[in-house]
Amino acid sequence: MMLRTEEMILNVGPQHPSTHGVFRLILKIDGEIIQEATPVIGYLHRGTEKIAEGLQYTQIIPYTDRMDYLSAMTNNYVLCHAVETMMGIEVPERAEYLRVLAMELGRIASHLVWWGTYLLDLGATSPFLYAFREREMIINLLNELSGARLTFNYMRIGGVKWDAPDGWIDKVKQFVPYMREKLHGYHELVTGNEIFRQRVTGVGRYTKEEAISYSLSGVNLRSTGVKWDLRKDEPYSIYDRFDFDVPVREGGDCLARYECRMAEIEQSLRIIEQACEQFPPEGPIMGKVPRIIKAPPGETFVRIEAPRGEIGCYIASDGKKEPYRLKFRRPSFYNLQILPKLLKGENLANVIAILGSIDIVLGEVDG
């Protein structure tokens, strides 16, 4: 007697704890095997780029906080960097160091959220609590610097909003060895755990050629063996002053993406350590910026390395106080595109493991 199966449509989301945002995934399944996966996005679309056309350049900065709200500092920076490039504004050295410290602390905080929630999705409760314990220390540091805990609005065109308060650099220095010790504990608890490794090894695999054809960037690209990091390959700000490595793995699976992100935390700690040692004892935090910012007519595009990949900012200016056109290249949007390919033919139980390993933020996907 032949066993007959029946196709079924299964909705994951839009309200689901493992989607980490308002995201819907329509799965066509045959038994436990996925035949087709269709992502449905747009639930968090707010029209940021269109709104920006009616705002002055400085008024756009708070909107960038709300794209990838887990790494708001890098979003702030890419907009300011684009306007500074168009106008030829020179940023003071002290401000550049503050920017780098803020962005790298934000990168670690972002990866900690990913680590904790990813393992929670896989069934491990304790790492989630540990991750948020360490993240809280970073959030407190950034709160002292910017006055906010999540949407910082800290960067300014030409510099930063506030100088570092007294003793802040010393607190950052103390955080580095503390975080290194905790990171070692994470590896003992999870990375070397045989149950975890069997759960993610070989799952959600793609090749470097596929990664490039889908325009993947960041960890999702480097996990296939492509050594590409804009902080090294196209240095911006003062990243060319720091000695750090670009973590690369060859597997292209969930484990490779996990190991790349964990290694990135260590490299961010190296950058922070060097930035604290090199930090100028005094100096201005704002460059020479006109009272009313009017970018000259023309176009520019800049890109930087955010925690989820390359974030870019395109500005077309007609010489007014507002941009004629503003466009962000949002890495989560591009990284999500490979998901249907990864899920086809996979077991239903692997959906959450694969989605979590890509590490998307829906505010960034929808814009």
Swiss-Prot record:
What Enzyme Commission number does this protein have?
7.1.1.-
Query: Where does it live in the cell?
Result: Cell membrane
Keyword Cell membrane (UniProt): yes
Q: How does it sit in the membrane?
A: Peripheral membrane protein
User: What keywords is this UniProt entry annotated with?
Assistant: Cell membrane, Membrane, NAD, Quinone, Translocase, Transport
Quote the cellular component terms of the Gene Ontology held in the record.
plasma membrane
InterPro entries per UniProt: NADH_Q_OxRdtase_suD, NDH1_su_D/H, NiFe-Hase_large
Disulfide links within the chain:
none
Pfam families linked: Complex1_49kDa
Membrane-crossing ranges are: none
Q: How does it assemble?
A: NDH-1 is composed of 14 different subunits. Subunits NuoB, C, D, E, F, and G constitute the peripheral sector of the complex.
Protein purpose: NDH-1 shuttles electrons from NADH, via FMN and iron-sulfur (Fe-S) centers, to quinones in the respiratory chain. The immediate electron acceptor for the enzyme in this species is believed to be a menaquinone. Couples the redox reaction to proton translocation (for every two electrons transferred, four hydrogen ions are translocated across the cytoplasmic membrane), and thus conserves the redox energy in a proton gradient.
Record protein name field: NADH-quinone oxidoreductase subunit D
